[in-house]
Amino acid sequence: IYYIFINGGNGSVAAGYRLSENLKKVGYACRLIVIPKTVDNDIAIVDHAPGFPSAARHTVITISELVHDMYTYDTDLIMAVEVMGRNTGYLAAAAAAAGKTGMGSGFDLCT
């Protein structure tokens, strides 16, 4: 094996780094190529990491459907939804932006 492609987020990159260091120690000539992909969208210098746009879309659709269900049942319940994002709030921000621009079902989010 001369090349290894690693596609993933923080954990995958860290594992690739450890693998690279171990391969260097034993003198194995192999190149590791990291392809960043994360729903957290927390990769430095990258505006939209692969994985984030589809996760944001799924989050907006899911919350819109939940809001529709709440309107259907006509209750005064309050719904809390927690989304992924590690130490960032990009998915929550995407859902909030969609709700405020009419792309969602007119929901309000506290971010």
Residue spans for each PLM region:
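Accessory alpha-helical/coil subdomains and C-terminal extensions
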Residues: I6-G8, A14-R18, N22-A29, I33, ...
